[in-house]
């Protein structure tokens, strides 16, 4: 979340930056400014009353030592206590209202994020169309060849759980496992520590990374419990250090494979065929913690490692810088990696690498000690490394051969022990 002090000191700056986001009501900042100013004035009054109470209390002590009447001073202290109680209650109510409002305020885009209304205004930074077989045309879409080769069972997935659920079978299941292992092994070689977290977390953790309260409808909640299925490993891995002071020398780079669960509210009718948009999907996530000074270096590190996987898999891709109108709620800057999907003859997102500044760490109280031993909020960065189901879809289409077989990417052969499917 934003620092209320920033809003109080630079209200016009905050408004001008958040105006660049789509559908943001800047009147919320005005409300926060009014509440913050009112609370600041109350805190001044509280401080003055506390000083006055202490001063009078010393007079009471002096009167008792001199064996003179202290009743007047004692009555005055009681009156001050009543005033303090009223002001403290008022301050608490205002603070609660501030926290409620500020929980819905998105992050401030960095200056190098382009202005735009939606994804049509995103900026293509680089394209790598000649990797592997290049921008080929698929002989068959992944959902057809996946069924023909008995790799994916859509009908039984729907029977078990409903639409947007699938069953991987035989070499399909093995490919998912191979991709998971390949990605985690590669990240480990590049300095990431592997985490296997719970797939269920409580609402405090969802709040910490920015999913709650704003995106409640996108989540699967366990009825009767304060537990949610994770939409991404970002949630549990970031919150490993919720309300902690961490050592950035020991805890800074993590990778995690998890199943992810999203209700896809608002996505009705989109990507209804295939494995591009599922309620349950597989993903490896990269999370880095850094000081402010090293945060953009960490952002580039996550981006580099996600790109490296696509290069090893020899899948054409491009880098896309998201504009202000398409930027995620918690993000200050995001670069998407999009792989080539032959059946659609277009690029599809396979990783979003995002820099959050201290937005998440303020919500989740993750801090570190700087060189002067002062506590500071860490800066957080994460990105998919990679979305496995979408990578599988690209492989099934990109690596089709004339004889109907599917070649296995070279880097996956050691995991599958076959060259073709």
Swiss-Prot record:
Source domain of life? Bacteria
Q: Where in the cell is it found?
A: Cytoplasm
Q: Which GO terms of the molecular function aspect are on file? A: ATP binding; serine-tRNA ligase activity
Q: Mind telling me which residue stretches traverse the membrane in this protein?
A: none
Reaction equations catalysed: tRNA(Ser) + L-serine + ATP = L-seryl-tRNA(Ser) + AMP + diphosphate + H(+); tRNA(Sec) + L-serine + ATP = L-seryl-tRNA(Sec) + AMP + diphosphate + H(+)
Pathways per UniProt: Aminoacyl-tRNA biosynthesis; selenocysteinyl-tRNA(Sec) biosynthesis; L-seryl-tRNA(Sec) from L-serine and tRNA(Sec): step 1/1
Question: Any idea which UniProt keywords this protein has?
Answer: Aminoacyl-tRNA synthetase, ATP-binding, Cytoplasm, Ligase, Nucleotide-binding, Protein biosynthesis
Q: Which residues bind ATP?
A: 262-264, 349-352
Recorded GO cellular component terms are: cytoplasm
Record-annotated residues binding L-serine? 232-234, 285, 384
Note the Pfam families from the entry.
Answer: Seryl_tRNA_N, tRNA-synt_2b
Instruction: Provide the domain comment.
Output: Consists of two distinct domains, a catalytic core and a N-terminal extension that is involved in tRNA binding.
Q: Which family does it belong to?
A: Belongs to the class-II aminoacyl-tRNA synthetase family. Type-1 seryl-tRNA synthetase subfamily.
Q: Function of this protein? A: Catalyzes the attachment of serine to tRNA(Ser). Is also able to aminoacylate tRNA(Sec) with serine, to form the misacylated tRNA L-seryl-tRNA(Sec), which will be further converted into selenocysteinyl-tRNA(Sec).
Q: Any idea what this protein is called?
A: Serine--tRNA ligase
Q: Give the source species.
A: Mycoplasma mobile (strain ATCC 43663 / 163K / NCTC 11711) (Mesomycoplasma mobile)
């Amino acid at each position: 979340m934003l620092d209320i002090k920033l809003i109080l000191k630079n209200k016009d700056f905050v408004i001008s930056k958040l105006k660049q986001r789509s559908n943001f009501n800047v009147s919320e900042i005005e409300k926060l400014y009014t509440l913050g100013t009112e609370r600041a004035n109350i805190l001044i009054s509280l401080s003055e009353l506390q000083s006055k109470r202490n001063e009078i209390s010393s007079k009471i002590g002096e009167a008792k030592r001199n064996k003179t009447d202290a009743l007047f001073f004692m009555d005055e202290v009681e009156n001050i206590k009543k005033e303090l109680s009223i002001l403290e209650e008022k301050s608490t109510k205002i603070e609660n209202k501030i926290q409620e409002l500020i929980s819905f305020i998105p992050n401030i885009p960095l200056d190098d994020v382009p202005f735009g209304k939606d994804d049509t205004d995103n900026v293509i930074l680089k394209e790598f169309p000649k990797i592997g077989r290049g921008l080929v045309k698929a002989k068959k879409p992944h959902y057809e060849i996946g069924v023909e080769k008995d790799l994916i069972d859509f009908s039984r997935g729907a029977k078990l759980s409903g639409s947007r659920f699938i069953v991987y079978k035989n070499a399909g299941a093995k490919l998912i496992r191979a991709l998971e292992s390949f990605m985690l092994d590669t990240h480990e070689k590049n300095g990431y520590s592997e985490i296997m977290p719970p797939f269920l977390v409580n609402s405090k953790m969802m709040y910490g990374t920015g999913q709650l309260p704003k995106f409640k409808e996108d989540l699967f909640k366990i009825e009767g419990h304060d537990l949610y299925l994770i939409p991404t490993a970002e949630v549990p891995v970031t919150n490993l250090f919720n309300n902690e002071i961490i050592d950035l020398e020991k805890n800074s780079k993590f990778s995690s494979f998890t199943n992810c669960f999203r209700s896809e509210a608002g996505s009705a009718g989109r990507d209804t065929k295939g494995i591009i948009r599922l309620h349950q999907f597989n993903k490896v996530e990269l999370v880095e913690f850094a000081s402010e000074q090293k945060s953009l270096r960490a952002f580039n590190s996550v981006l580099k490692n996600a790109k490296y996987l696509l290069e090893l898999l020899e899948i054409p891709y491009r880098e896309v810088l998201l504009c202000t109108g398409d930027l995620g709620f918690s993000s200050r800057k995001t670069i998407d990696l999009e792989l080539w999907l032959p059946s659609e003859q277009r690029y599809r997102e396979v990783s979003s690498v995002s820099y959050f500044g201290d937005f998440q760490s303020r919500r989740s109280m993750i801090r570190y000690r700087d060189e002067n031993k002062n506590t500071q909020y860490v800066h957080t960065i994460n990105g998919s490394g990679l979305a496995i189901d979408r990578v599988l879809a690209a492989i099934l289409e990109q690596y089709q051969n004339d004889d109907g077989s599917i070649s296995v990417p070279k880097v996956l052969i050691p995991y599958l022990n076959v060259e073709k499917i």
